[in-house]
């Protein structure tokens, strides 16, 4: 790995900007950012991104372009940092333009569009026959772009069944404030990434209704039980759920107003119609839908998932939602 290798970041939003800074601070000097928002790209050229971060925060000056072909020309690494609803269409365009061997790195969360596939699975499937793609690595774990930019100490994971690829990404990103661990359990990591967004919606709802830490602890622990049941069924490892991509990301996402999913839950209580207008950027909604539908064939007892689905997609009332969650049969904790 050479620190002058070209890195193409796809996206110019908050997380894309944070990843660009991390990579720069890790000694990488040849970074190109592709985006479609002219103002964001102009800002990034002069060391800021005012749409997402305070102008008091000074960033490196980056090469930017609205031309995907220029961004990808003779690149070595592609970092996908765009909303999941756009990722497949964008990736299929990328595959047509490649002219060099690349390692694809995804920091996008959620499911592959119009499928039950995780993003990692979808990217791997679509690039399987492409001669230029040498692998796909998912970078995931507890991290808000707003804190990464401020160089808050952050640890997440590089995940791939090919550990050498994961280790390569680990070295590419790690620096004095941003540290990657490697792991090979793609399934478990993706289950954690999906479930934590769903549970963050629930915790946001509870928070807005005035419930406190007792309730939050119940949501997280009972939600983790459902996450484990689902993870066991689809073949993930328990150890993964107990690590950064499971419990770690759950604590972050389900307890902070910086989380779009937590904020969606709060807004849902205040103004449901307005909240649902943000559906494209709330990854937990698609995750909820996919987990609920896939569980139709598994038949697992997932009361949080089923009740939350009925609340958001089948319009039961908040009071009915509470009754479904709370008034269940008394039984042993681990039944």
UniProtKB/Swiss-Prot annotation:
Query: Which catalytic reaction applies to this protein?
Result: sn-glycerol 3-phosphate + NAD(+) = dihydroxyacetone phosphate + NADH + H(+); sn-glycerol 3-phosphate + NADP(+) = dihydroxyacetone phosphate + NADPH + H(+)
A GO cellular component entry from the record: cytosol
Q: Does the keyword Lipid metabolism apply?
A: yes
What GO biological process terms does the UniProt entry carry, in alphabetical order?
carbohydrate metabolic process; glycerol-3-phosphate biosynthetic process; glycerol-3-phosphate catabolic process; glycerophospholipid metabolic process; phospholipid biosynthetic process
* Localization: Cytoplasm
- The EC code for this enzyme is 1.1.1.94
Q: Which Gene3D superfamilies match?
A: N-(1-d-carboxylethyl)-l-norvaline Dehydrogenase, domain 2 (1.10.1040.10), NAD(P)-binding Rossmann-like Domain (3.40.50.720)
Q: Which Gene Ontology molecular-function terms are recorded? A: glycerol-3-phosphate dehydrogenase [NAD(P)+] activity; NAD binding
The entry's sn-glycerol 3-phosphate-binding residues are 109, 141, 143, 196, 249, 259-261
Q: Where does this protein hold NADPH?
A: 109, 145, 260, 283
SUPFAM superfamilies reported in the protein's UniProt record: 6-phosphogluconate dehydrogenase C-terminal domain-like (SSF48179), NAD(P)-binding Rossmann-fold domains (SSF51735)
Q: Which residues form the active site?
A: 196
For this UniProt record, give its keywords in alphabetical order, as a comma-separated list: Cytoplasm, Lipid biosynthesis, Lipid metabolism, NAD, NADP, Nucleotide-binding, Oxidoreductase, Phospholipid biosynthesis, Phospholipid metabolism
Q: InterPro entries, alphabetically?
A: 6-PGluconate_DH-like_C_sf, 6PGD_dom2, G3P_DH_NAD-dep, G3P_DH_NAD-dep_C, G3P_DH_NAD-dep_N, NAD(P)-bd_dom_sf
Q: What is its main location?
A: cytoplasm
Q: Which Pfam families match?
A: NAD_Gly3P_dh_C, NAD_Gly3P_dh_N
Role this protein plays: Catalyzes the reduction of the glycolytic intermediate dihydroxyacetone phosphate (DHAP) to sn-glycerol 3-phosphate (G3P), the key precursor for phospholipid synthesis.
Family as reported in the entry's similarity comment: Belongs to the NAD-dependent glycerol-3-phosphate dehydrogenase family.
> What's the protein called, per UniProt?
Glycerol-3-phosphate dehydrogenase [NAD(P)+]
């Amino acid at each position: 790995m050479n620190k002058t290798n070209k890195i193409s970041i796809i996206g110019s939003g908050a997380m894309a900007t944070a990843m660009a800074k991390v990579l720069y601070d890790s000694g990488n000097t040849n970074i190109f950012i592709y985006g479609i928002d002219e103002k964001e790209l102009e800002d990034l050229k002069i060391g800021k991104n005012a749409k997402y971060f305070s102008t008091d925060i000074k960033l490196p000056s980056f090469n930017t372009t609205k031309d995907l072909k220029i961004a990808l020309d003779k690149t070595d690494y592609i970092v996908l940092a765009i909303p999941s609803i756009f990722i497949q269409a964008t990736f299929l365009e990328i595959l047509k333009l490649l002219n060099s061997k690349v390692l694809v790195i995804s920091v996008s969360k959620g499911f592959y569009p119009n499928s039950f596939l995780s993003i990692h699975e979808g990217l791997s499937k679509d690039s399987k026959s492409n001669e230029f793609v040498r692998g796909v690595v998912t970078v995931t774990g507890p991290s808000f772009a707003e804190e990464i930019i401020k160089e808050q100490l952050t640890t997440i994971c590089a995940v791939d069944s090919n550990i050498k690829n994961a280790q390569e990404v680990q070295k590419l990103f790690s620096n004095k404030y941003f540290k990657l661990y490697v792991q090979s359990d793609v399934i478990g990591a993706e289950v954690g990434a999906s479930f934590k967004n769903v549970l963050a919606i629930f915790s946001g709802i509870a928070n807005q209704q005035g419930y406190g830490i007792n309730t939050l602890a119940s949501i997280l622990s009972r939600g983790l039980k459902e996450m484990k049941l689902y993870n066991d069924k689809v073949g993930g490892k328990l150890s993964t759920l107990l690590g950064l991509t499971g419990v770690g990301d759950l604590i972050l996402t389900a307890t902070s107003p910086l989380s779009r999913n937590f904020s969606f839950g709060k807004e849902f209580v205040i103004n449901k119609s307005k909240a649902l207008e943000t559906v494209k950027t709330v990854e937990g909604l698609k995750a909820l839908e996919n987990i609920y539908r896939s569980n139709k064939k598994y038949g697992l007892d997932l009361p949080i998932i089923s009740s939350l689905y009925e609340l958001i997609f089948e319009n039961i009332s908040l009071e009915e939602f509470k009754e479904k969650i709370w008034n269940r049969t008394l039984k042993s904790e681990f039944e």
